[in-house]
């Protein structure tokens, strides 16, 4: 054979597979200190006024304690993104110091180098009111926001099965908030005590809620 190589195709294929395996990126488990959160949107089907309806689920989780907050909205948009934060901060009685996001167009105008982002004016308005630090996941690094994605699936299985039948979104969200409160009594896997125990440490690390309420609506400047 050319260059003196006498090995077969299978040997080459096995060698390439071994090289790829040895060079695969390894995602180490992330360690989350108290006072941090992750945010995401998902979807679910509910019966609203007798009609099957797809709703958008705003989810905020606290990885340290495992606490979760879920609310349903007609759709994912700037207004529901802002309102979801406002309600989550009220539910948790404080503001997480750092919040992790994907690169949704609601918050990000342009992805720059590394973690640098050009942010939308509405996201900056939210951040300047509550003073939390933003953290945007690197592209194709799903593990950086894995906690909220896992708990989104958990909420679908445990809060929305069987398919809830409600008269209104208000009624659905009251039920979801109650399920989130009840979930604080559950044990966290691998830990002693309930989720409510480490939530005390989360809250101790939170920023205080601002005295002035936040206007969770898109603000357009008059031309």
List the predicted regions and their residue ranges.
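RNase H-like two-metal-ion nuclease catalytic core shared by retroviral integrases
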Residues: 101-102, 113-114, 134-156, 170-172
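Active-site beta-loop-alpha junctions of metal-dependent nucleic acid enzymes
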Residues: 70-98
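Short, conserved catalytic/metal-binding motifs centered on acidic residues
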Residues: 40, 66, 99-102, 127, ...
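RNase H-like polynucleotidyl transferase catalytic core
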Residues: 122-123, 128-145, 164-166
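Acidic/histidine-rich, metal-coordinating catalytic segments
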Residues: 95-115
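Short, basic interhelical loop/turn and adjoining N-cap
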Residues: 2-11
């Amino acid at each position: 054979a050319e260059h003196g190589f006498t090995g077969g195709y299978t040997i080459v294929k096995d060698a390439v597979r071994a090289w790829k395996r040895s060079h695969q990126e390894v995602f180490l488990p992330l360690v989350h200190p108290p006072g941090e959160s992750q945010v995401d949107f998902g979807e679910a089907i509910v019966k609203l006024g007798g009609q099957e309806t797809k709703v958008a689920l705003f989810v905020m989780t606290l990885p340290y304690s495992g606490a979760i907050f879920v609310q349903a909205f007609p759709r994912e948009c700037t207004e529901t993104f802002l309102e979801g934060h406002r309600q989550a901060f009220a539910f948790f009685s404080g503001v997480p110091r750092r919040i992790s996001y994907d690169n949704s167009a609601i918050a990000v105008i342009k992805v720059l180098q590394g973690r640098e982002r050009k942010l939308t004016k509405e996201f900056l308005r939210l951040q300047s009111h509550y003073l939390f630090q933003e953290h945007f996941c690197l592209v194709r690094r799903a593990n950086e926001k894995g906690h909220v994605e896992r708990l989104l699936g958990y909420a679908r299985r445990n809060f929305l099965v069987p398919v809830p039948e409600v008269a209104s979104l208000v009624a659905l969200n009251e039920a979801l908030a109650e399920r989130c409160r009840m979930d604080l009594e559950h044990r966290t896997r691998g830990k002693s005590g309930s989720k409510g125990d480490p939530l005390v440490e989360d809250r101790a690390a939170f920023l205080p809620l601002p005295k002035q309420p936040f206007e969770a609506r898109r603000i357009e400047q008059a031309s």
